[in-house]
């Protein structure tokens, strides 16, 4: 059924229908309320569901109110009521405030990572408290660099150990029995039957808990179980000392050795 025009109240057929301001109009009836200028959907402005042109669109004006004592009192009372209501709502919602966060895959990944970090820290503290202060150093080094140890060990087995030819010694066999693993702790490999005597000296003595291959000229290579003498601490990550088996002196990583 065809609707009626909002202005002339006659039937509006689809060919001349204008649907605007929640009403139906003839194209000729859709004009400004003041100047009767024909309008369209691009240049009309609606006010109280009536069409107006841009020139005759009603302007909103503000009424000036005198700043009398009565008005000041009402203004102050309104502000006090707003503050009281705000404080009441604040006290009511105190401790209950929370923000809703979308459960995205990125947030799930971050939450899972935080749970894993917390679990690792808990087990680390538990192992330290169970082993005591003296037995926890080797495990700490083992936990700190397990990947570096497994990465460097095959490289050390492939390369023969360099021993100066000036002193006749028996060469250590390359293939050594694999170190057995109990939990997170690895037994050191069996040392060579005959080792070259290195000049002893004072200072701190450390024992290697991993194999290490020198990556620079000022570093030294050593094997698991070697004794490092004359050790001097450079910083938190590096030391300087002499490998007692080979007599080489240079820098070595601090997390590859433990104090004797």
From Swiss-Prot:
CDD domains: LIM_LASP, SH3_Lasp1_C. The modification N-acetylmethionine is found at residue 1. Nebulin repeats lie at residues 61-95, 97-131. This is LIM and SH3 domain protein 1. The modification N6-acetyllysine is found at residue 42. Phosphorylated. The keyword Cytoplasm applies. Pfam families: LIM (PF00412), Nebulin (PF00880), SH3_9 (PF14604). GO terms for biological process: monoatomic ion transport. Keywords: Acetylation, Actin-binding, Cytoplasm, Cytoskeleton, Ion transport, LIM domain, Metal-binding, Methylation, Phosphoprotein, Repeat, SH3 domain, Transport, Zinc. InterPro entries: Lasp1_SH3, LIM-SH3_domain_protein, Nebulin_repeat, SH3-like_dom_sf, SH3_domain, Znf_LIM. Residues 140-155 have a biased composition (Basic and acidic residues). Disulfide bonds: none annotated. Residues 5-56 form the LIM zinc-binding domain. One of its GO terms (molecular function) is metal ion binding. GO terms for cellular component: cell cortex; cytoskeleton; focal adhesion. The modification Phosphothreonine is found at residues 68, 104. The modification Phosphoserine is found at residues 99, 118, 134. Plays an important role in the regulation of dynamic actin-based, cytoskeletal activities. Agonist-dependent changes in LASP1 phosphorylation may also serve to regulate actin-associated ion transport activities, not only in the parietal cell but also in certain other F-actin-rich secretory epithelial cell types. It is found in: Cytoplasm, Cell cortex; Cytoplasm, Cytoskeleton. Residues 171-180 have a biased composition (Low complexity). Residues 123-204 are annotated as: Disordered. Interacts with F-actin. Interacts with ANKRD54. Interacts with KBTBD10. Residues 201-260 form the SH3 domain. The keyword Lyase does not apply. The modification N6-succinyllysine is found at residue 112.
């Amino acid at each position: 059924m065809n609707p009626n025009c909002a202005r002339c109240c006659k039937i509006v057929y689809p060919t001349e229908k204008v649907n605007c301001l929640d009403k139906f109009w003839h194209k000729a009836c859709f004009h400004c309320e003041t100047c009767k200028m024909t309008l369209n959907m691009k240049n009309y402005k609606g006010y109280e569901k009536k069409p107006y042109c841009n020139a005759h669109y009603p302007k909103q004006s503000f009424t000036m109110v005198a700043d009398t004592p009565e008005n000041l009192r009402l203004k102050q009372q309104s502000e006090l009521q707003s503050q009281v209501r705000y404080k009441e709502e604040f006290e009511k919602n105190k401790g209950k405030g929370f923000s809703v966060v979308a459960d995205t895959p990125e947030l799930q990944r971050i939450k899972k990572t935080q749970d894993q970090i917390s679990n690792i820290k808990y087990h680390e503290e538990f192992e330290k408290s169970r082993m005591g202060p003296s037995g926890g150093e080797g495990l700490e080094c083992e936990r700190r660099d397990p990947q570096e140890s497994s990465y460097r060990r095959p490289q050390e087995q492939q390369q023969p150990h360099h021993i100066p030819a000036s002193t006749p010694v028996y060469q250590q066999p390359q293939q050594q029995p694999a170190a057995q693993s109990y939990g997170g702790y690895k037994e050191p490999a069996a040392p060579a039957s005959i080792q070259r005597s290195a000049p002893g000296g004072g200072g701190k003595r450390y024992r290697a808990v991993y194999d290490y291959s020198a990556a620079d000229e000022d570093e030294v290579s050593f094997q698991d179980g070697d004794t490092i003498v004359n050790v001097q601490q450079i910083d938190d990550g590096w030391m300087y000392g002499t490998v007692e088996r080979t007599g080489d002196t240079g820098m070595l990583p601090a997390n590859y050795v433990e104090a004797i």
